């Protein structure tokens, strides 16, 4: 985090904007991974160091863990609301998937026209193997407690209601 001091001749006091850089893959592991545990002190400091007029988040991330994206984004929103400090996101090269999630926690987003932006969503891929196992007389046994626990099981025929629920 770094503070940007802006001096304007007609203002009597210095206005500061604290900057948080959220760059890299979002996840729980690795030294350079973005995650809530590693970045919570940085984010907390951005909202409490001095009396910032705003907090700027610089985002450059292809995404990653939806849970970590949610935790970081929720922390930023909570602090912004508690301290009544606006948040501005500046997208550098890419803010896709969880990276866009982080940018979307800001009050306003700025991006270069060439930046790659967007694509929050889920992709799920699999195979339909029910005919293969039937051909070889293989019986599959699945035991679950609750509804929709084996949704889109590759060893059963696809159900439209499962597809609709996933979308």
Where are these regions (language model features)?
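Small-residue-centered hinge/linker elements
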Residues: 1-85, 94-101, 105-167
């Amino acid at each position: 985090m770094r503070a940007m001091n802006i001096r304007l001749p007609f203002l009597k006091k210095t206005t500061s904007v604290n900057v948080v850089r959220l760059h890299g893959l979002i996840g729980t592991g690795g030294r350079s991974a973005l995650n809530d545990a590693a970045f919570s002190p940085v984010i907390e400091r951005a909202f409490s160091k001095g009396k910032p007029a705003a907090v700027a988040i610089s985002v450059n991330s292809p995404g990653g863990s939806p849970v970590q994206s949610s935790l970081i984004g929720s922390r930023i929103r909570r602090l912004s609301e508690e301290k009544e400090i606006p948040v501005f996101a500046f997208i550098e090269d890419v803010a896709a998937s969880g990276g866009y999630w982080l940018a979307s926690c800001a009050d306003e987003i700025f991006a270069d026209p060439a930046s790659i932006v967007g694509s929050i969503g889920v992709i799920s891929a699999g195979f339909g193997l029910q005919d293969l196992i039937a051909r070889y007389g293989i019986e599959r046994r699945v035991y679950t407690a609750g509804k929709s626990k084996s949704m889109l099981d590759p060893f059963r025929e696809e159900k439209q209601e499962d597809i609709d629920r996933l979308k």
